[in-house]
Each structure stands twice: as C-alpha cells, then as structure tokens.
C-alpha cells in the first residue's frame, strides 16, 4: 500500500525527522489560508498523486508549455494561481502512463534553500536478508537512470537486524553521501530514525529523494515516498487509515476484497492462473507469441467457485481485454471448481471476447466435462504452449 507525500512526511515527523512545515488542501479556496500558515516567503505547491516524476510531468489540460506538478511560488497569490492550475487536472508523468492521474490534493510547503540534493532509501535487500540503505550523491533525479548510467554512484549499506544502525553504519552512509560538519551530526540522528520507522511500520520501501543539505548545513527530508507490506497492515490501523482508494485501480481494489493477487497491466490478454510462478510463466509465453498480458491474476490454491467467478468478472471489466487465458494446474485447487466458477461468471456477465482454458491436475476430466457440456464458446487447450497459441490466434483473427 502506498501513501501520499504529505502523509509520509507527517509519519516521519512523528519519529523526529527534519521536515518542512506544510499544509494539505483539497480545494483551491483553501490555498490562501494554507500558505498563510507557513513562514514564507518561498512556497512549494506539490501535486499529491501516487507516482514519481511529478516535477517533470505535464498536465493534459494545460498544454505542453505549462509548468509541471511541483511548482515554486514567491507569493501567496502565486500559490493560489498554481493551485487553480493543478487541482482537478490530469498529471502525466513517466510513471503514470499516458492516462495520467487526476490531482485531487495539493501539499503547500515552506520552501528551502538547497545546497545539495542527495538520494536515500531503505528496502529489504533479499541478497543478504537484511534491511539496507541505498544512497547516492545524485539526488533529486531519476535514480534508475543513475543506476544505469553511473552505477558506481549507488551505494548499499546493509544493517545487522540484531544491532540496528550502528555508529559505523552511520559513518559509512555519511561517507557515501559525502556529509561533513553539521550535516554529519544530523545524520547521527536521522538515519536511525529512518530505520526505526521502516521496521516499526512494516514498510516495503522508504524513499527520500531528495534528502537535502540546506545552505545552513542541516539535513532535511524534502520528498518522501512510502510503500507498506500489505500482509502486515492488520498490525497498523493508523497506516490503513491513510489509504487513498482514488489513487488505486478500481479492479485491484475489488480484487483485494476477494483476497486475489491482481495487478493491472497494459496488454490485451486477460490471465487467470493459480500460483504466482505459473502466472509469470503464462505472461512470459503470451509475450513470446507477440502479445502482452492485461493483468497478473493469481486466484491462489484454495479458491472456491465464488472467488473464481469474481476473478473472471474483474478481468472482463477491463476494456482493454480482447481475449482471456485461464491456465490452471490443480493441486489443492480442483479443476472442476475452476470450471464451475468460469461457467457461472460467463453466464452472469456474458462472453464478448475469446476464452481459452487449459486445465491440468486434480479432477481435470470432470473440469473439462463441465466446460464441454456448458454450451459456452470456450476453447480447450492441451498444454500451456497450445493455450498461448490459441488465444493469440483468436485475437489476431
């Protein structure tokens, strides 16, 4: 689960991290009052969407020459003007895709005198089984581009979970970021704070980009991104309360209600599979034959008829879907249950696109019999390769 920048900063502020004063608004009419609560005279008006690259993004409604989703303002009047431009309009960034995201919230923040921009994130480094700091002196920009073009500028410092962030760890991180003086002193408090927040809130990612050194030498969290482990949210009602469903795909929200592992993608072949590994293999073979998957959908090992039907309806609700491939290897999952769910869903919502079903495993013959006798336009496949060829051929006509 992701949250907005202003929410992430409020959380970090609660742990004692240095963040600027700011006020979130939902309406243009709130902009003036929000700005008056801040010291000024420099303000920053920030679009709040669950995507990066906001500063370089463009608003669909404002034309190619308009400013992006993060704007400086040197007066309260400018704050109001920027707010009027941004709220309610669609921001397109490198991470949103061409559709963009509607800006429903802004964060009005006090400006800062920036001397240096750095990058700092925490994540689980699975190669060593520890939480690690990933840092770079090249902050405020696309860290993926830095990693690709100048990987030597990316430094990873893994933290021993039994010891936490030690003085040696702080020294190593500070050296990698070329911190000295006041900034190095601030680092002694900040890096343990970030680590503590990451662990206590069960985060999957904590990204500060940029972490700035101000003209006075002190550190400040200028932007913050947080992603939380959805499996741990039952422990964090305070974090769950921060969820903004308007930022999420409606199909993914519906899938979460049925405990389905569903991720919307950009292709045109809907996939329903049991098991994450089989789901990835299914998507790979679709790409091998020249098409793109429209989703990742894992119904799991113990799904019942109703859950299967729900998954099918979610897939067919995507207007991009031109064909559907159901690929089931039944172990705990029974093929007849899959067949019953698919048949029930098709009878309820109709079948407007080609449907190919490959079943193998427990009760496979019964599952195939149910499909064959359903009277529905369902194409059976003998194996995964056959299934992929048939769904691609059906779409190509």
From Swiss-Prot:
Its EC number is 6.2.1.5. PANTHER family: SUCCINATE--COA LIGASE [GDP-FORMING] SUBUNIT BETA, MITOCHONDRIAL, SUCCINYL-COA SYNTHETASE BETA CHAIN. Mg(2+) binds at residues 209, 223. InterPro entries: ATP-grasp, ATP-grasp_succ-CoA_synth-type, ATP_grasp_subdomain_1, Succ-CoA_synthase_bsu_CS, SUCC_ACL_C, Succ_CoA_ligase-like_bsu, Succinyl-CoA_synth-like. It comes from the Bacteria. HAMAP family: Succ_CoA_beta. This is Succinate--CoA ligase [ADP-forming] subunit beta. Succinyl-CoA synthetase functions in the citric acid cycle (TCA), coupling the hydrolysis of succinyl-CoA to the synthesis of either ATP or GTP and thus represents the only step of substrate-level phosphorylation in the TCA. The beta subunit provides nucleotide specificity of the enzyme and binds the substrate succinate, while the binding sites for coenzyme A and phosphate are found in the alpha subunit. ATP binds at residues 46, 53-55, 109, 112, 117. The lineage of its organism: Bacteria, Pseudomonadati, Pseudomonadota, Alphaproteobacteria, Hyphomicrobiales. It holds the Pfam family ATP-grasp_2. It comes from Agrobacterium fabrum (strain C58 / ATCC 33970) (Agrobacterium tumefaciens (strain C58)). Keywords: ATP-binding, Ligase, Magnesium, Metal-binding, Nucleotide-binding, Tricarboxylic acid cycle. The keyword Cytoplasm does not apply. The gene is sucC. Its cofactor is Mg(2+). The keyword 4Fe-4S does not apply. GO terms for cellular component: cytosol; succinate-CoA ligase complex. Binds 1 Mg(2+) ion per subunit. Residues 9-254 form the ATP-grasp domain.
């Amino acid at each position: 689960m992701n949250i907005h920048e202003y929410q992430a900063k409020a959380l970090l502020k609660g742990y004692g991290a240095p963040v600027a004063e700011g006020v979130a608004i939902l309406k243009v009419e709130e902009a003036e009052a929000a700005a008056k609560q801040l010291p000024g005279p420099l303000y920053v008006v920030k679009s709040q969407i669950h995507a990066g690259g906001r500063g370089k993004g463009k608003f669909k409604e404002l034309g190619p020459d308009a400013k992006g989703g993060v704007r400086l303002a040197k007066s309260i009047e400018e704050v109001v003007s920027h707010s009027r431009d941004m709220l309610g309009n669609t921001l397109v960034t490198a991470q949103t895709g061409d559709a963009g995201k509607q800006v429903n919230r802004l964060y009005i923040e006090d400006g800062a005198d920036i001397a240096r921009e750095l990058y700092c994130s925490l994540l689980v480094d699975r190669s060593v089984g520890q939480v690690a700091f990933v840092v770079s002196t090249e902050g405020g920009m696309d860290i993926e581009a830095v990693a690709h073009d100048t990987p030597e500028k990316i430094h990873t410092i893994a933290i021993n979970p039994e010891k936490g962030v030690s003085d040696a760890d702080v020294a190593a991180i500070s050296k990698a970021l070329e911190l000295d003086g006041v900034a190095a002193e601030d680092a002694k408090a900040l890096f343990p704070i970030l680590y503590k927040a990451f662990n206590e809130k069960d985060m999957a990612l904590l990204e500060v980009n940029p972490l700035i050194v101000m003209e006075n030498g002190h550190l400040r969290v200028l932007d913050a991104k947080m992603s939380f482990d959805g499996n741990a949210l039952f422990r964090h009602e305070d974090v769950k309360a921060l969820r903004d469903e308007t930022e999420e795909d409606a199909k993914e929200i519906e899938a979460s209600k049925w405990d389905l592992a569903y991720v919307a993608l950009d292709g045109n072949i809907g996939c329903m599979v049991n098991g994450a590994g089989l789901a990835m293999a299914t998507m790979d073979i679709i790409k091998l034959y020249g098409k793109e998957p429209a989703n990742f959908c894992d119904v799991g090992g113990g799904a019942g008829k109703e859950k299967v039907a729900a998954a099918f309806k979610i897939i067919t609700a995507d207007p991009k879907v031109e064909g559907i491939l159901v690929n089931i290897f039944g172990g705990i999952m029974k093929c007849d249950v899959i067949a019953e769910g698919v048949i029930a869903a098709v009878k309820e919502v109709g079948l407007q696109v080609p449907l190919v079903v490959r079943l193998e495993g427990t009760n496979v013959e019964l599952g195939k019999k149910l499909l064959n006798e359903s009277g529905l336009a369902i194409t059976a496949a003998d194996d995964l390769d056959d299934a992929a060829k048939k769904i691609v051929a059906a779409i190509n006509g």
